[in-house]
């Protein structure tokens, strides 16, 4: 008989979000950071373009914008980290509680599955014993019938 894992056992049931989903989640949590990053990148691109054209004043202006956008992005990042740090502790506690409950449920399902299998095995053993007893009784009766026939012939 092959050993199968109980149906309550599951591996990798919880999907890890892919990179794009993680990025979208972070953007929703701190929307000013990606906006600041895009503005900074735009300022650098415009500065590079104006530098290539030889427009020194515009280049300086765009680099100043870049510094301002980077500062705003950094402030948004720090402020978001502080506010999210507090809420993430609460979320972490609730997530740990959920994981604990899920582990208890899995353990309960595992035990129920083992008990069910044990009941099946016990029922098979009982049927086997009943079959053995029935065969013994039939064999005994057959031997007795043979003896009676043998004694009747003598």
Swiss-Prot record:
Its main location: mitochondrion. It comes from Lodderomyces elongisporus (strain ATCC 11503 / CBS 2605 / JCM 1781 / NBRC 1676 / NRRL YB-4239) (Yeast). InterPro entries: Hypoxia_induced_domain, RCF1. It is a multi-pass membrane protein. Signal peptide: none annotated. One of its GO terms (cellular component) is mitochondrial inner membrane. This is Respiratory supercomplex factor 1, mitochondrial. Residues 89-144 form a coiled coil. Belongs to the RCF1 family. The chain crosses the membrane at residues 31-48, 63-85. Keywords: Coiled coil, Membrane, Mitochondrion, Transmembrane, Transmembrane helix. GO terms for biological process: mitochondrial cytochrome c oxidase assembly; mitochondrial respirasome assembly; regulation of proton transport. It comes from the Eukaryota. It is found in: Mitochondrion membrane. Associates with the respiratory chain complex III/complex IV supercomplex. The keyword Mitochondrion applies. Residues 4-95 form the HIG1 domain.
